[in-house]
UniProtKB/Swiss-Prot annotation:
Organism: Panagrellus redivivus
Family in the record: Belongs to the FARP (FMRFamide related peptide) family.
Its job: Myoactive.
Top-level taxon: Eukaryota
Localization in the cell: Secreted
A biological-process GO annotation: neuropeptide signaling pathway
Coiled coil found in the keyword field: no
Protein name: FMRFamide-like neuropeptide PF2
Length: 9
């Protein structure tokens, strides 16, 4: 699952 937290970068 793609976590929005990882997309924060």
């Amino acid at each position: 699952s793609a976590d929005p937290n990882f997309l924060r970068f």
